Amino acid sequence: MFLRHCITFTLIALLAGCAGFGSKEAVQGQGNPQLWRQHKQQLSGLDGWQINGKVGIRAPRDSGSGTLFWLQRQDYYDIRLAGPLGRGAARLTGRPGGVMLEVANQGRFEADSPEALLEEQLGWRLPVSHLVWWVRGLPAPDSKSQLTLDGDSRLARLTQDGWQVEYLSYIEQNGYWLPERLKLHGENIDVTLVVKDWQPRQLGH
């Protein structure tokens, strides 16, 4: 079950890509809206990164933790998850129009989109969409969001499409202030992400 939740976590990351932003935002909190807009503009141009970290998942009948590697190069992604004590591993690679999932001891699966792969392999229909934005500390651009800013005009809390994201700490890397620790709360599932190493890149278009 933990591996299934890990696969779900990776799939959440892949729909929005690195397109422009323009969501309908309701902003509150301590921060300065103008500084937030400047921060958002900078991060929206960040279209490449490498992340190493840990992920923890808690669900009604299952919980666990594992390691995360995430390589993003514009619309190409390579996301790898490994469970504790080597119990299982999954690798998801692809770009728009083609996705491949490799699961240890289970095989290789392909689909046209992450959503299709999730439904085909796990039988779940979930709002697979926004983590590629959320991991940068941004709301996804194509739906309404409620934002709470911290005293540094960065996201402290985000509510969007039935999910709540809490930003617990940030780290500065290569001139970018990026989330270091965040918690995601969805329907019957909680995810904690701790980034141990951020390597951001602006690759251009």
Curated annotation (Swiss-Prot):
It holds the Pfam family LolB. The keyword Protein transport applies. InterPro entries: LolA/LolB/LppX, OM_lipoprot_LolB. It comes from the Bacteria. It is found in: Cell outer membrane. A lipid is attached at C18 (N-palmitoyl cysteine). A lipid is attached at C18 (S-diacylglycerol cysteine). GO terms for biological process: lipoprotein localization to outer membrane; protein transport. HAMAP family: LolB. Monomer. Plays a critical role in the incorporation of lipoproteins in the outer membrane after they are released by the LolA protein. This is Outer-membrane lipoprotein LolB. It comes from Pseudomonas entomophila (strain L48).
